[in-house]
Amino acid sequence: MGDEIVIDKTAFFNRLSSFYAAWKADKRSTNSVFGGAGSIIILMGKTDEANSYQKNNAIHFWLLGYEFPATLFVFTPEVMYVVTTAKKAKHLEPLKGGKIPVEILVTTKDQEEKTRLFEKCVDIIKSAGNKVGILPRDTTTGPFVEDWKRVYGKISGDVEEVDISPALSAACFSVKDTDELVSIRNASRACSGLMSDYFVDEMSRLLDEEKQMTHKALSMRIDAKIDDAKFFNKLAKLPSEFDPQQIDWAYGPVIQSGGKYDLKLTAVSDDNNLEPGIIIAGFGIRYKTYSSIIGRTYLVDPTKSQEANYSLLLSVHEAVLKEARDGVVAKELYNKAIGIVRARKPELESHFVKNVGAGIGIELRDSNMILNGKNTRVLKSGMTFSITVGLVDVEEPSVKDKKKNVYSMMITDTVRVGEQGPHVFTKDAGIDMDSVSFYFGDEEEPQKPAKEKKETKSSAIASRNVTRTKLRAERPTQVNEGAEARRREHQKELAAKKTKEGLDRFAGTTGDDNGVTQKKFKRFESYKRDNQLPAKVKDLTVYVDHKASTVIVPVMGRPVPFHINTIKNASKSDEGEYAYLRINFLSPGQGVGRKDDQPFEDLSAHFLRNLTLRSKDNDRFAQVAQDITELRKNALRREQEKKEMEDVVEQDKLVEIRNRRPVKLPDVYLRPPLDGKRVPGEVEIHQNGLRYVSPFRNEHVDVLFSNVKHLFFQPCAHELIVLIHVHLKTPIMIGKRKTRDIQFYREATEMQFDETGNRRRKHRYGDEEEFEAEQEERRRRAALDREFKAFAEKIADAGKDEGVDVDIPFREIGFTGVPNRSNVLIQPTTDALVQLTEPPFLVISLNEIEIAHLERVQFGLKNFDLVFVFKDFHRAPVHINTIPVENLEGVKDWLDSVDIAYTEGPLNLNWTTIMKTVVSDPYGFFADGGWSFLAAESDSEDGSDEEEESAFELSESELAADESSEEDSDYDDDASADDDFSADEDESGEDWDELEHQAKKKDRESGLDDEDRGKKRKR
């Protein structure tokens, strides 16, 4: 050992402390992994190059960073004893004086002195207890080992030996710190780069050029590449401070093909030539003693069954990776894998590997952390594993050569267990079908003369497709024709089903007149008896009774009360010395506006239109007119508030949990907030609902499970908050506001600090610090997600009798749009379409949707709109505007997958008019084809560009007419022409068709077809 050896004291004491803490905690545990050992022996003899990484030297690397041959460690609960030579002892001297004492016993060449030190260690072991932890599987050898065994053998019968290997795995090697993870990540990136940037190129070149090379020779090429520092320095994923001198082989490289495969780590490359078919490559690299391993299967001209089996293996691999998260029992990973194989291809169950990986770190394979169906160890964040899925000796009947009709497959990745899932360190070497498939044989197939004509046609079609997709705006609309055909067929079935459901639903019913629900006449009474009149009426003056909402007017010497609901307005005017008060009353036929829809009990009765009173008291009449106006405003406001509160149902009482403390989620904010300051409160789960408790004034909000329609949990991935959202069946009041959505959230971000000049930053600037910061951010977010998800599941469990279930948005199929005023991300869930991040929230229940319509779907536009029509036709359709056209196919696929019928068209429609038509006669609407008129608009798009333009103009004029009848419009001239248009509609339609036919004929004569015109116009 050279003088350059420097042991990291900080790392040594941190790791030694964690080891002792785990040992002491284990003594209090009911599930002991240390086996009750009072002392622990770690014996290291000569360095064994053939079997260089076992538990004994792994503990050396873990604690010291180096291997110290001919050294004995004896751990007791109070002291760590080290027996070694004087040369090695000087490197250990700085470790004295720590929190845990380290006593160094120096041996010499004097055999008696060495025996005396060993006897001292034996006495220490005996005094520590009758159980001693050893490593029975380690096969260390050498004179030092023999001398120790001779002395130790005298007491070996007096003490009970326990295997300490599982304890070392759990306490030392399983959960890695930041430095260890950085080393494993760098080793993994070196593996990925060597596999994807070197081996794949070499392999494909050999096969393409049909050169012969043995597996062993190719392995030696890869072996030599590890000394090429320039190669590793050029790898983009490796950090700038990566030291190529610190890497070494941990395993392999091993190349296999041609029907002979061995998926064990003991496999070696044989002398057979590399052959096409199934090629398996695997190797492992160490960086600063920490291992990473990678394995890939490459398919060269594969058969259909081989492709299918590899796709199955990909699915299994992905499923196992998803299970590799904090808190999962190790055996669940294997059970998940074998369950998928058993469900999808039971005939391959016997060919599946017996485990799906093992722990990896200093040891290439930790035998105590094998991921099989029996391991009950719990995975923790920070653990690292080599995940391996494989199929062994699968027969391929289509291959005639009996020596090659058997193949194996394998995928191996090095991963880190995270809070919510794994971090795949070797992901840069692709495993998808496109990355591992190679096709060389197809190029040699001769073209048959009989198919020459057909081939020419295909080439023409292909070139035309290239021409059509040369514009970027068109590319998102290119879809798989087979999938599009299946989707179109499914939509036809859904449309027919909707029409049939509509006919069955509205059979024998009549709609609302003019598509508007008729208001009922409401009786109102100012006073039931004469003695209830105010005393001031004796003065025979105009009196405004605010309490009774009545205006009392003297008529013929008698006070006559008029309820404010009969009064339209009041005005005061001056003429000479007199002031005039005019009171206008509501009566039939006064107006045709939408607001003039006051119902009357008997339209044939006589109605008083207005009263005019005269007085010289100008100020008095001004005050009366003002009082009547205010009274009318207050009455209208009360009516509006009453209307808004019609659907607010008073909830039952919340049944609180009394016999124990309720489950709580602390430090959460409420939306919509309670009145006052924005402060965090807590959510409690009670017997029949939730209660949000504010820290101020003992305010609270109760939500009953019986009123919960949807319960959502949205994690904080790509968001600033993590939230639980409750969508209610009927709205409730929070303060003075009515709401149907209640949200509990917590912010996921922290205050960031600039560490410039900080001593810590000065010494840790670079990749390690960045990695640590990322780790901390992920850890904090993952902890938030875990806490909120667990609480949401507890809510669902408490409300399961009311059908409460947790729904999580699918961000990967979400799309941006404008449901209100701002552009937000809208995400589907299992039962709804939601936007929960920004208020106002959007929650659309899928089972309430009648049909969806895509508007403004036409060439040249960068976005489109989406309209949802509900089964309750009195409910206004919901619009989501300005969705990027890139999401068009994704939106269609999602709508089709959840069985929502959809149509599309090039224009925005007047949905107020459409829904009035539907509501006025729903049965007649469905009898005439229902929503098929929307689909007809979509079908017309398949015609030429000329047809699209004429349809556009026709629809625009119709729309303008509809809109002008509904509300003020800039196109009044078009609206006024609507009657004239309807008189000769059929005739003008024929004229346009005839003109269009003539125009097409002339274009054909000039050699210009529709497609050419379309392209010209596009330029």
UniProtKB/Swiss-Prot annotation:
Residues 446-457, 483-498, 995-1007 have a biased composition (Basic and acidic residues). Transmembrane segments: none annotated. Residues 443-498, 755-774, 936-1019 are annotated as: Disordered. Residues 477-501, 625-651, 775-798 form a coiled coil. Residues 458-468 have a biased composition (Polar residues). Residues 938-994 have a biased composition (Acidic residues). It is found in: Nucleus; Chromosome. InterPro entries: Creatin/AminoP/Spt16_N (IPR029149), Creatinase/aminopeptidase-like (IPR036005), FACT-SPT16_Nlobe (IPR029148), Fact-SPT16_PH (IPR056595), FACT_SPT16_C (IPR048969), FACT_SPT16_M (IPR013953), Pept_M24 (IPR000994), PH-like_dom_sf (IPR011993). CDD domains: CDC68-like. Its main location: nucleus. GO terms for biological process: constitutive heterochromatin formation; DNA repair; DNA-templated DNA replication; nucleosome assembly; positive regulation of RNA polymerase II transcription preinitiation complex assembly; regulation of sister chromatid cohesion; transcription elongation by RNA polymerase II. The keyword Nucleus applies. The keyword DNA repair applies. Keywords: Chromosome, Coiled coil, DNA damage, DNA repair, DNA replication, Nucleus, Transcription, Transcription regulation. Belongs to the peptidase M24 family. SPT16 subfamily. Component of the FACT complex, a general chromatin factor that acts to reorganize nucleosomes. The FACT complex is involved in multiple processes that require DNA as a template such as mRNA elongation, DNA replication and DNA repair. During transcription elongation the FACT complex acts as a histone chaperone that both destabilizes and restores nucleosomal structure. Forms a stable heterodimer with pob3. The spt16-pob3 dimer weakly associates with multiple molecules of nhp6 to form the FACT complex. This is FACT complex subunit spt16. It comes from Emericella nidulans (strain FGSC A4 / ATCC 38163 / CBS 112.46 / NRRL 194 / M139) (Aspergillus nidulans).
